[in-house]
Design a protein with these regions (language model features):
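Conserved MFS/SLC helix-loop-helix module at the cytosolic interface between two early adjacent transmembrane helices
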Residues: 56-95
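Intracellular juxtamembrane helix-capping segments at the cytosolic ends
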Residues: 109-123
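Glycine-rich segments within core transmembrane alpha-helices of 12-TM secondary carriers
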Residues: 126-146
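Hydrophobic core of transmembrane alpha-helices in multi-pass small-molecule transporters
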Residues: 84, 95-110
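Small-residue (Gly/Pro/Ala) motifs that create kinks and tight helix-helix packing interfaces
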Residues: 29, 61, 140-151
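Extracytoplasmic
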Residues: 6-32, 38, 112, 116
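Juxtamembrane helix-start elements in MFS-like secondary transporters
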Residues: 29, 38-47, 130
Length: 151
C-alpha cells in the first residue's frame, strides 16, 4: 500500500504541475506579443500549436512507450517541457516558437497520458484515484495565476 501511495503521489504532483503549466501558456502570451512583436493571430496560432502538440502526444506516446518503456518515455517527454519553456524565453523567430509550442504540447500530453495509465492500472478499478488525479490538475490550474503573481 505504501509503494502504491508513493506512486500515486508522484502522479498527483506531476498533474498538479501540469495544470499550473497549462495556464502559464495563456499568461505569457501578452508578454510574448509585446516582446517578440507578434500579432494576435500569431499568438492564437501558438495556442493552436500547443493544442496540436497535445493531440499529437496521443500518436507519439504509445509507440514510444512500447519501444523504450513508460519510465523512459515519461522522463524524456517531461524533459521537453522545461526545455521548450527555456527556448520560448529566448524569444526565437516565429517558426521556432511554433515548433516549441508543438513540442511543449507533446510533453504536456504525454505526461497526461502516462499518468492516467499508471493511476488507472494501479487503482484496482476504483474511480476515486483517477478523480483525485484530475482534481490535482484543476488545483494546479487554479493556483497557477496566484503563484505567478508572487513573482
Amino acid at each position: 500500500m505504501k509503494s502504491k501511495w508513493k506512486l500515486f503521489f508522484s502522479c498527483y504532483f506531476a498533474f498538479f504541475v501540469n495544470g499550473a503549466m497549462v495556464l502559464l501558456v495563456g499568461a505569457i502570451l501578452p508578454y510574448l506579443i509585446e516582446e517578440a512583436g507578434i500579432s494576435y493571430s500569431v499568438a492564437g496560432g501558438l495556442l493552436s500549436a500547443f493544442a496540436i502538440g497535445n493531440l499529437l502526444a496521443s500518436f507519439v506516446n504509445p509507440p514510444l512507450a512500447g519501444k523504450i518503456g513508460r519510465k523512459a518515455t515519461i522522463v524524456s517527454m517531461s524533459a521537453l517541457i522545461p526545455l521548450m519553456w527555456l527556448i520560448i524565453t529566448w524569444i526565437p523567430p516565429v517558426p521556432v516558437l511554433y515548433a516549441a509550442f508543438v513540442l511543449l504540447g507533446i510533453g504536456r500530453g504525454s505526461v497526461s497520458i502516462i499518468n492516467n495509465a499508471v493511476v488507472n492500472d494501479n487503482s484496482d478499478g476504483k474511480p476515486a484515484a483517477l478523480n483525485l488525479l484530475h482534481m490535482t490538475f484543476a488545483v494546479g490550474a487554479f493556483l497557477s495565476p496566484f503563484l505567478t503573481s508572487l513573482y
